[in-house]
Regions:
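Sec-dependent, cleavable N-terminal signal peptides
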Residues: 1-35
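Ligand-recognition elements built from short beta-strands and adjacent flexible loops
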Residues: 574-673
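A short acidic, often aromatic-flanked loop/helix-cap motif at beta-alpha or helix-coil junctions
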Residues: 18, 242, 644
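C-terminal PAP-associated
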Residues: 29-573
């Protein structure tokens, strides 16, 4: 949410649900539209620093920003910043399930096994409340050697062991020289590591005054290398003239060359709000060139659409070539929808002379029943439902939206999506928050639910504000806030998970505590508004999670925590086959006088193992050597070549699949700066 500078109360108008627009796992034939406005040659900066213009299709615009070089962050002097010690007002009245509509949860897990979840590896404090604001909007991501966190109005960079290399710094420091972003520090930040480009993406929104008059901006910066303390390239996009781009969420989608953003849009004239889908021109941004964006206002496609999330790609495998980018939301029947479900849309962007965007409804997936209403006694708008010890102040569960990220993976044989949101684990008789999580899967055709569950062990604890992700082996983890109204259960941090082979629809590895709380928040109900679970690009196994907690009772004394953990089975080689059964006993010798038959000749020796050349392109050199050795081959000549994929194999000879004698040498080409 907005970073403590303003108090904004904007009504989110809801139109009636259009049943004819909802398709059950069937493609839409009428909901996609295309931009047709040309922007000129890609290398052209059109008429200034940034711009936007209407396109011919309803609710669409196109725009651009020039690129601004940023010196290394470790050398930058922090930008001027005025602290404003106030909490924020609620930003919308998004659909909340109504009292009386509650039904039992159809996928609740009442028990949790103990001592199976791995403990934290790294576990250190991140940024605390330097801005005097609430909530912190905690998020961050991990790269090859660093963790970068951006909490509301400040970012910081750490080594993976928690050493601070760039101290907490006002967010607008990242945008020197830009016309608006250099002086406006509004928050709602997102940090992502783009492992396909070997660069970081960091963003926050910006506006002048109190956010009630336009235009409105999105500030985006891309690092020059995989080292976030080095130089960056900044962009200052004017994204709308009259609608505030609140609560933006990003997803990297390389096969569409897009940094894709979704955001609730709040008109300054008080008319109905809507959702927006923005695509920013990734291939030009990672090379620090002027870049364009395309935008679809979803008001023209579905005026009742609630908050949506764009898929964010993880892992070494790219999405399939030209695959559209999934966008999802969860819908509670208690908020006026026909049934509890997940809606799936597909976004496609093109970046020729005439850029285009198409957002098409794929359909919806019925889910096990859930309720996002946590009780009619919760203060309006029925989200402030989490009790704390020693205070009557309840904190915000944000049960009415899918929580960041929508984590995507391409496992080759199938694709997967994972996300979580807060529901009532004790419905209909109770009002205790639990974590609903999903693993969606697609082999061909449409997405479907592979696993789903509500993690709500019968221990009286509330679990809320979660985030989910999957590792390279298909294991899933969910991090979240945990606590209740009885000491010592102050707002803390926990996580749970499942292995790929665990029983379906359960977090069968149980729960582990990341960091206990030590106090309550008494001055504001705001919490979150999001947290972040990511996976380490180095091993594709280690999860990293960050969110807030309370250490000592006070008004808004939040702190943040950054921790990692890893399932031991992830990335391990398959177990060896069982030994063959013992041979049967020899038959008794024949009676004399005939002599026993001669013993059978020994079996021929097994054939010498062959070298079957594996595919190692895209792997780091050490991993490539390991894979070559396991294939009964050996590493030959290693040549270095300039590439954006530093340290990764970009060429091999011979190609994969060739069979040679054992120990045959495979020559490699490795990327360098």
């Amino acid at each position: 949410m907005r970073g403590g500078h303003v108090r904004i109360l904007l009504a989110f108008g809801l139109a009636a649900f259009v049943a004819a627009g909802a398709l059950l796992l069937a493609p839409s034939k009428s909901s996609g539209r295309h931009v047709t406005a040309a922007l000129g040659a890609p290398d052209t900066v059109l008429g200034g620093t940034s711009s936007f213009s209407s396109a011919s299709a309803p609710g669409q615009t196109v725009g651009y920003s020039r690129a601004y070089r940023v010196p290394p962050l470790r050398t930058l002097k922090p930008a001027p910043f005025k602290y404003i010690p106030q909490s924020e007002a609620f930003e919308d009245a998004a659909p909340i399930a109504q009292p009386g509509s509650k039904v039992p949860d159809g996928a609740v897990q009442r028990s949790a096994r103990k001592n199976l979840m791995p403990g934290p590896i790294a576990n250190f404090d991140g940024i605390s409340n330097l801005c005097g604001c609430s909530p912190p909007d905690t998020n961050g991501d991990v790269g090859p050697n660093h963790y970068m966190e951006w909490v509301n109005l400040h970012y910081a960079i750490y080594t993976k062991t928690g050493t601070v290399v760039v101290p907490p710094t006002p967010g607008n420091t990242l945008f020197p020289g830009t016309p608006h972003c250099a002086s406006l520090n509004r928050g709602d930040p997102i940090v992502l590591y783009d492992q396909y480009a070997g660069k970081w993406m960091a963003s926050q929104f910006a506006f002048t005054g109190g956010g009630t008059t336009g235009p409105f901006y999105q500030c985006i910066a891309i690092s020059n290398t995989s080292d976030p303390t080095s130089g960056w390239c900044a962009y200052d996009f004017t994204v709308h003239a009259t609608k505030l781009n609140d609560y933006p969420k990003f997803g990297i989608w390389p096969t569409q060359n897009s940094y894709t953003m979704t955001a609730p849009l709040f008109p300054t004239n008080g008319s109905a709000g809507s959702q927006g889908v923005f695509g920013f021109e990734r291939d030009r941004m990672i090379t620090c060139q002027s870049a364009r964006f395309v935008f679809q206002d979803m008001l023209s496609l579905d005026p009742s659409l609630p908050r949506i999330l764009p898929a964010d790609a993880d892992g070494p495998n790219l999405p399939p070539a030209n695959a559209p980018q999934p966008i999802v939301t969860d819908n509670d029947d208690g908020a006026g929808f026909p049934q509890d479900r997940i809606d799936v849309w597909n976004a496609t962007m093109t970046w020729g002379t005439t850029p285009t965007i198409s957002v098409v409804r794929q359909g919806y997936i019925p889910t096990a029943p859930f309720d996002t209403n946590l009780g009619s006694t919760c203060p309006s708008p029925q989200r402030q439902c989490i009790p704390q010890p020693g205070t009557t102040n309840k904190i915000d569960a944000l049960p009415n939206r899918p929580m960041y990220r929508l984590a995507y993976r391409n496992y080759g044989a199938h694709e997967a999506l994972a996300f979580a949101h807060t529901v009532d684990a004790d419905a209909p008789s109770g009002n205790r928050a639990g974590m609903r999580w999903y693993e969606l899967r697609k082999t061909t055709g449409s997405w479907g639910i592979q696993n789903q569950g509500t993690f709500g062990p019968a221990d009286g604890l509330y679990r809320w504000m979660g985030a989910a992700a999957m590792d390279g082996s298909g294991d899933l983890a969910v991090g979240y806030s945990i606590g209740n109204g009885t000491a010592p259960n102050y707002p803390g941090i926990a996580y749970a998970g499942r292995l790929v082979g665990d029983p379906p629809d359960t977090l069968a590895q149980g729960e582990a505590m990341m960091h206990p709380g030590g106090g309550s928040q008494t001055g504001s109900p705001r919490w979150g508004d999001y947290s972040m679970m990511t996976t380490d690009p180095v091993d594709d196994c280690t999860f990293w999670y960050t969110t807030e907690y309370i250490q000592t009772t006070g008004s808004v004394p939040w702190r943040t925590r950054i921790a990692s953990f890893k399932f031991p089975s992830c990335g391990a080689p398959p177990p060896p086959p069982p030994p063959p059964p013992p041979p049967p006993p020899p038959p008794p010798p024949p009676p004399p006088p005939p002599p026993p038959p001669p013993p059978p000749p020994p079996p021929p020796p097994p054939p010498t193992a062959k070298c079957r050349v594996p595919r190692v392109i895209g792997l780091r050199l050490a991993a490539a050597k390991t894979r070559i050795r396991r294939a009964n081959c050996s590493t030959g000549r290693i040549r270095r070549s300039r590439s954006t994929r530093v340290g990764r194999v970009i060429g091999q000879s011979p190609k994969a699949g060739v069979v040679r004698a054992r120990g045959f040498k495979v020559n490699l080409v490795v990327g360098r700066r």
